[in-house]
Regions:
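Structured mid-to-C-terminal alpha-helical surface segments
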Residues: 1-151
Length: 151
């Protein structure tokens, strides 16, 4: 037979962003389409760019944020995967510290804001829900590590 149920498929999720890149350091990822003798290539932001963008969103929205998974993503990229410190500093400066629309003007400001956000009761409760914690690591450990990183 022919049709969708006989065609192999791979489900994926792609986050499409339209923004000014801090760094032109994009990773080129190629997906081989097998029997079609073709491939699809996408460009992916660096880990540093992703951390800076997720951090910016968290700082901007604060405890009202509902993007709890981003907290675990930031932790993973900073503490498990690793980032290049200079490139992260460049991205954080461009997207947060030097952006006139942001309130944070230093790493101290960032750490203070993160402490307030992570200390909010509702935010802590939602962050601790299992579906948000794809790393299965204590939310307190995650938030402490992120705050310490930017201190």
């Amino acid at each position: 037979g022919v049709g969708p149920r006989y065609c192999p498929s791979i489900e994926t999720k792609v986050d499409i962003g339209v923004h000014n890149l801090v760094s032109p350091d994009l990773a080129e990822i190629c997906f081989d389409l097998g029997k079609l003798d073709d491939a699809v290539t996408i460009l992916a932001d660096s880990n540093e760019q992703v951390v800076a963008e997720k951090l910016r969103s968290l700082l901007r929205i604060g405890a009202a944020s509902t993007r709890y998974k981003d907290v675990f993503d930031i932790y993973y990229l900073l503490c498990k995967k690793g980032v290049r410190e200079r490139e992260l500093d460049d991205a954080v400066r461009a997207l947060v510290i030097e952006d006139p629309t942001m309130r944070e003007r230093s790493y101290g400001d960032i750490a203070n804001r993160l402490s307030r956000v992570f200390g909010d009761r509702r935010f802590k409760r939602e962050l601790s829900r299992a579906k948000n914690n794809w790393l299965e690591i204590s939310p307190d450990k995650v938030t402490s590590a992120i705050t310490a990183y930017f201190s």
